[in-house]
Amino acid sequence: AFHGRTMGALALTHKAAYREPFEPLPGGVEFIPAGDIEALRGALGPDVAALIVEPIQGEAGVRELPAGYLEAARELTEAVGALLIIDEVQSGMGRSGAWMAHHLLAPGVVPDVVTLAKGLGGGIPIGAVVATGEAAALLGPGQHGTTFGGNPVACAAALAVIDTVRSQDLLVRVEQLGSAWARELAAVDGVNEVRGRGLLIGVGLAEGLPPAGEIAATLLAERGFIVN
Protein backbone atom coordinates (compact mmCIF):
# COMPACT_ATOMS: atom_id res chain seq x y z
CA ALA A 1 0.00 0.00 0.00
CA PHE A 2 1.04 3.60 -0.55
CA HIS A 3 -0.63 6.26 1.59
CA GLY A 4 1.81 9.17 1.57
CA ARG A 5 5.23 10.47 2.59
CA THR A 6 4.55 12.54 5.72
CA MET A 7 5.19 10.74 9.00
CA GLY A 8 1.70 9.47 9.81
CA ALA A 9 0.92 8.42 6.25
CA LEU A 10 4.42 7.04 5.75
CA ALA A 11 3.90 4.70 8.69
CA LEU A 12 1.02 3.20 6.70
CA THR A 13 3.08 2.85 3.51
CA HIS A 14 4.59 -0.59 2.91
CA LYS A 15 7.53 0.11 0.59
CA ALA A 16 10.82 -0.04 2.50
CA ALA A 17 12.56 2.47 0.22
CA TYR A 18 10.13 5.18 1.35
CA ARG A 19 10.14 4.19 5.02
CA GLU A 20 13.80 3.53 5.84
CA PRO A 21 15.18 7.10 5.54
CA PHE A 22 12.67 8.30 8.17
CA GLU A 23 12.60 5.42 10.63
CA PRO A 24 11.69 4.99 13.42
CA LEU A 25 8.11 5.69 12.35
CA PRO A 26 4.97 5.63 14.50
CA GLY A 27 4.15 2.05 15.44
CA GLY A 28 1.01 0.01 15.85
CA VAL A 29 0.70 -0.71 12.13
CA GLU A 30 0.27 -4.17 10.62
CA PHE A 31 0.42 -4.83 6.87
CA ILE A 32 -1.66 -7.63 5.35
CA PRO A 33 -1.91 -8.87 1.75
CA ALA A 34 -4.30 -6.78 -0.32
CA GLY A 35 -7.48 -8.60 -1.27
CA ASP A 36 -6.99 -11.50 1.16
CA ILE A 37 -10.20 -11.70 3.19
CA GLU A 38 -8.92 -14.46 5.48
CA ALA A 39 -5.79 -12.44 6.29
CA LEU A 40 -8.03 -9.48 7.05
CA ARG A 41 -10.25 -11.59 9.26
CA GLY A 42 -7.23 -12.82 11.19
CA ALA A 43 -5.77 -9.33 11.64
CA LEU A 44 -8.90 -7.57 12.88
CA GLY A 45 -9.81 -7.60 16.55
CA PRO A 46 -10.99 -5.33 19.36
CA ASP A 47 -7.52 -3.76 19.61
CA VAL A 48 -7.62 -2.50 15.99
CA ALA A 49 -8.56 1.16 15.54
CA ALA A 50 -8.91 1.24 11.76
CA LEU A 51 -8.33 -0.49 8.45
CA ILE A 52 -7.09 1.70 5.60
CA VAL A 53 -7.17 0.48 2.01
CA GLU A 54 -6.75 1.77 -1.53
CA PRO A 55 -9.62 0.53 -3.73
CA ILE A 56 -7.20 0.56 -6.66
CA GLN A 57 -3.57 0.33 -5.61
CA GLY A 58 -1.62 2.87 -7.63
CA GLU A 59 1.95 2.30 -6.44
CA ALA A 60 1.47 -1.47 -6.71
CA GLY A 61 0.79 -1.19 -10.44
CA VAL A 62 -2.86 -0.11 -10.69
CA ARG A 63 -4.37 -3.22 -9.15
CA GLU A 64 -7.95 -3.11 -7.92
CA LEU A 65 -9.19 -5.00 -4.90
CA PRO A 66 -11.04 -8.19 -5.88
CA ALA A 67 -14.82 -8.37 -5.94
CA GLY A 68 -16.31 -8.77 -2.49
CA TYR A 69 -13.28 -7.52 -0.57
CA LEU A 70 -14.58 -4.08 0.35
CA GLU A 71 -17.94 -5.55 1.37
CA ALA A 72 -16.11 -8.02 3.63
CA ALA A 73 -13.92 -5.23 4.99
CA ARG A 74 -16.99 -3.18 5.89
CA GLU A 75 -18.66 -6.13 7.62
CA LEU A 76 -15.54 -7.19 9.52
CA THR A 77 -14.57 -3.69 10.68
CA GLU A 78 -18.08 -3.03 11.95
CA ALA A 79 -18.01 -6.31 13.86
CA VAL A 80 -14.93 -5.28 15.88
CA GLY A 81 -15.67 -1.55 16.11
CA ALA A 82 -12.87 -0.44 13.79
CA LEU A 83 -13.08 2.37 11.26
CA LEU A 84 -12.97 1.62 7.54
CA ILE A 85 -10.83 4.26 5.83
CA ILE A 86 -10.68 4.29 2.03
CA ASP A 87 -7.75 6.15 0.48
CA GLU A 88 -9.02 7.80 -2.71
CA VAL A 89 -6.10 10.21 -3.08
CA GLN A 90 -5.05 8.71 -6.43
CA SER A 91 -8.28 7.06 -7.52
CA GLY A 92 -10.85 9.64 -6.45
CA MET A 93 -12.37 12.80 -7.94
CA GLY A 94 -13.33 11.20 -11.24
CA ARG A 95 -10.09 9.58 -12.33
CA SER A 96 -11.68 6.12 -12.36
CA GLY A 97 -14.83 7.24 -14.16
CA ALA A 98 -16.76 7.71 -10.91
CA TRP A 99 -16.40 10.29 -8.17
CA MET A 100 -14.76 7.58 -6.05
CA ALA A 101 -13.32 4.27 -7.22
CA HIS A 102 -15.06 2.41 -4.42
CA HIS A 103 -18.38 3.53 -5.92
CA LEU A 104 -17.51 1.28 -8.87
CA LEU A 105 -16.02 -1.64 -6.97
CA ALA A 106 -18.49 -1.78 -4.08
CA PRO A 107 -21.47 0.55 -4.61
CA GLY A 108 -23.17 -0.45 -1.35
CA VAL A 109 -20.18 0.16 0.91
CA VAL A 110 -20.12 3.37 2.95
CA PRO A 111 -16.72 3.90 4.61
CA ASP A 112 -16.27 5.85 7.83
CA VAL A 113 -13.52 8.00 6.32
CA VAL A 114 -12.34 8.84 2.80
CA THR A 115 -9.05 10.64 2.13
CA LEU A 116 -8.72 12.93 -0.90
CA ALA A 117 -6.02 15.07 -2.53
CA LYS A 118 -4.29 15.24 -5.95
CA GLY A 119 -7.19 15.69 -8.41
CA LEU A 120 -9.28 17.49 -5.79
CA GLY A 121 -7.44 20.76 -6.43
CA GLY A 122 -6.86 20.54 -10.18
CA GLY A 123 -3.16 21.31 -9.71
CA ILE A 124 -3.51 23.44 -6.56
CA PRO A 125 -2.25 21.62 -3.43
CA ILE A 126 -5.13 20.53 -1.21
CA GLY A 127 -6.06 17.46 0.78
CA ALA A 128 -9.25 16.55 2.57
CA VAL A 129 -10.50 13.99 5.06
CA VAL A 130 -14.20 13.22 4.63
CA ALA A 131 -15.82 11.50 7.61
CA THR A 132 -19.34 10.20 8.11
CA GLY A 133 -21.44 9.06 11.06
CA GLU A 134 -19.71 8.69 14.42
CA ALA A 135 -16.30 9.12 12.80
CA ALA A 136 -17.21 12.70 11.91
CA ALA A 137 -17.46 13.54 15.62
CA LEU A 138 -14.05 12.16 16.58
CA LEU A 139 -12.25 15.47 15.97
CA GLY A 140 -13.58 18.79 17.18
CA PRO A 141 -12.39 22.39 16.84
CA GLY A 142 -8.99 22.89 18.44
CA GLN A 143 -8.10 19.20 18.69
CA HIS A 144 -6.01 19.18 15.54
CA GLY A 145 -5.11 21.65 12.83
CA THR A 146 -2.80 22.79 10.08
CA THR A 147 -1.42 26.22 9.25
CA PHE A 148 -2.94 26.29 5.79
CA GLY A 149 -6.02 24.17 6.47
CA GLY A 150 -9.08 25.68 4.83
CA ASN A 151 -6.90 27.87 2.60
CA PRO A 152 -9.41 29.96 0.60
CA VAL A 153 -7.49 29.74 -2.68
CA ALA A 154 -7.14 25.95 -2.46
CA CYS A 155 -10.77 25.53 -1.42
CA ALA A 156 -11.92 27.75 -4.30
CA ALA A 157 -9.88 25.57 -6.67
CA ALA A 158 -11.51 22.41 -5.28
CA LEU A 159 -14.99 23.88 -5.72
CA ALA A 160 -14.10 24.83 -9.30
CA VAL A 161 -12.90 21.27 -9.98
CA ILE A 162 -16.13 19.78 -8.63
CA ASP A 163 -18.22 22.22 -10.66
CA THR A 164 -16.24 21.49 -13.84
CA VAL A 165 -16.50 17.72 -13.45
CA ARG A 166 -20.25 18.05 -13.00
CA SER A 167 -21.01 20.70 -15.61
CA GLN A 168 -18.91 19.12 -18.36
CA ASP A 169 -19.96 15.51 -17.72
CA LEU A 170 -16.33 14.57 -17.21
CA LEU A 171 -17.12 11.27 -15.50
CA VAL A 172 -18.68 10.06 -18.75
CA ARG A 173 -15.75 11.46 -20.70
CA VAL A 174 -13.24 9.70 -18.46
CA GLU A 175 -15.02 6.39 -18.99
CA GLN A 176 -15.08 6.91 -22.76
CA LEU A 177 -11.42 7.92 -22.98
CA GLY A 178 -10.33 5.16 -20.62
CA SER A 179 -12.08 2.50 -22.68
CA ALA A 180 -10.55 3.87 -25.89
CA TRP A 181 -7.05 4.02 -24.39
CA ALA A 182 -7.36 0.50 -23.01
CA ARG A 183 -8.30 -0.83 -26.45
CA GLU A 184 -5.45 1.01 -28.15
CA LEU A 185 -2.90 -0.03 -25.53
CA ALA A 186 -3.97 -3.67 -25.67
CA ALA A 187 -3.22 -3.69 -29.41
CA VAL A 188 0.39 -2.52 -28.96
CA ASP A 189 3.10 -5.14 -29.53
CA GLY A 190 4.57 -6.27 -26.23
CA VAL A 191 1.58 -5.31 -24.10
CA ASN A 192 0.12 -8.35 -22.35
CA GLU A 193 -2.19 -6.69 -19.83
CA VAL A 194 -4.09 -3.42 -19.37
CA ARG A 195 -5.43 -2.82 -15.87
CA GLY A 196 -7.48 -0.16 -14.14
CA ARG A 197 -10.63 1.88 -14.45
CA GLY A 198 -11.27 5.06 -16.42
CA LEU A 199 -8.03 7.02 -16.78
CA LEU A 200 -6.28 5.24 -13.94
CA ILE A 201 -4.47 2.74 -16.14
CA GLY A 202 -1.64 0.27 -15.61
CA VAL A 203 0.11 -1.54 -18.44
CA GLY A 204 1.82 -4.90 -18.17
CA LEU A 205 4.54 -5.63 -20.71
CA ALA A 206 5.99 -8.86 -22.01
CA GLU A 207 8.97 -10.30 -20.18
CA GLY A 208 12.28 -8.71 -21.10
CA LEU A 209 10.90 -5.24 -21.85
CA PRO A 210 11.63 -2.24 -19.59
CA PRO A 211 8.81 -1.14 -17.26
CA ALA A 212 5.96 0.63 -19.07
CA GLY A 213 6.46 3.74 -16.95
CA GLU A 214 10.11 3.97 -17.96
CA ILE A 215 9.22 3.73 -21.65
CA ALA A 216 6.44 6.30 -21.32
CA ALA A 217 8.63 8.72 -19.34
CA THR A 218 11.37 8.57 -21.97
CA LEU A 219 8.96 9.19 -24.86
CA LEU A 220 7.22 12.05 -23.03
CA ALA A 221 10.51 13.72 -22.09
CA GLU A 222 11.63 13.56 -25.73
CA ARG A 223 8.46 15.47 -26.62
CA GLY A 224 9.03 18.21 -24.05
CA PHE A 225 6.78 17.01 -21.23
CA ILE A 226 7.81 17.29 -17.58
CA VAL A 227 7.44 13.80 -16.10
CA ASN A 228 7.25 12.84 -12.43
Regions found by a protein language model. Name each.
Residues 1-228:
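Conserved N-terminal phosphate-binding loop of PLP-dependent enzymes in the Aspartate aminotransferase
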